[in-house]
């Protein structure tokens, strides 16, 4: 069964391709390689014996999308492609709305023309905004994200619900991620951000391997046990398995189904630093910096719905997330080859 994976050479997309292949699916990748490298395909082949076909292009290219649907019997689409840095989105809102919202519109139109009406969308816990209760449950109201990135994800969620309401033949699953970290346990695949990392774990990894001098921890006066921000960190392979679970339940379930994918427990920035220091066997340099606008003190997921309806649960601990990230970064100090 062929699955089109937009953004499939990126961090989460590539790990999901591995898990899809192991589950018997045949991913076809569309990626403009703006934050990834095509050399990941060789790593996917090393792990699975299968090399997905890569179309190096943009989801806003309707002609390219039509050619992909014409060339392959695509059964479903997993839609990862999009810009994803919260802070960057504040300074570049037009690019975020163009990529994330307009790009999804072009994809949906191409899917409709090809009569492919099975979609899994990569959303984010940022759609919840600041909630008065923790953990976050899917039934919580949305509508107050604090960044253009979060608003772009929420806009797409609303578009998907409108599309499905107009045409009930669509099967749509929205997966709201919390904080994906970690790497494939083989050390062959991991997160390789272009430029300065926007996320905590890859920045720590680059400090540990000597590419960065010190980690900036944004804020140490939050109302949390150690004063640093608390987040729900989920191992990327657990997250990838969540997509496979969603694929297995997608067909024949018309509607829009929303699931949190998180570990269901929060860890502070300093706890993550301690876990990584343990993994790499040395202390890591860090310093405190002012809070970033829009950052919340603490949140984590209630993933009960995914457990009950998808049969999915996380199985990897924070220590494993840190150890697997270090295994990847120490084997690949400069990331993937160009």
From Swiss-Prot:
InterPro entries: NAD(P)-bd_dom, NAD(P)-bd_dom_sf, UDP_G4E. NAD(+) binds at residues 11-12, 31-36, 58-59, 80-84, 99, 124, 149, 153, 178. It catalyses: UDP-alpha-D-glucose = UDP-alpha-D-galactose. Disulfide bonds: none annotated. GO terms for biological process: galactose metabolic process; monosaccharide metabolic process. It comes from the Bacteria. Its EC number is 5.1.3.2. GO terms for molecular function: UDP-glucose 4-epimerase activity. The active site is at residue 149. Pathway: Carbohydrate metabolism; galactose metabolism. Its cofactor is NAD(+). The keyword Cell membrane does not apply. Substrate binds at residues 124, 149, 179, 199-200, 216-218, 231, 292-295, 299. One of its GO terms (cellular component) is cytosol. Keywords: Carbohydrate metabolism, Galactose metabolism, Isomerase, NAD. Homodimer. Involved in the metabolism of galactose. Catalyzes the conversion of UDP-galactose (UDP-Gal) to UDP-glucose (UDP-Glc) through a mechanism involving the transient reduction of NAD. Belongs to the NAD(P)-dependent epimerase/dehydratase family. This is UDP-glucose 4-epimerase. It comes from Yersinia pestis. The gene is galE.
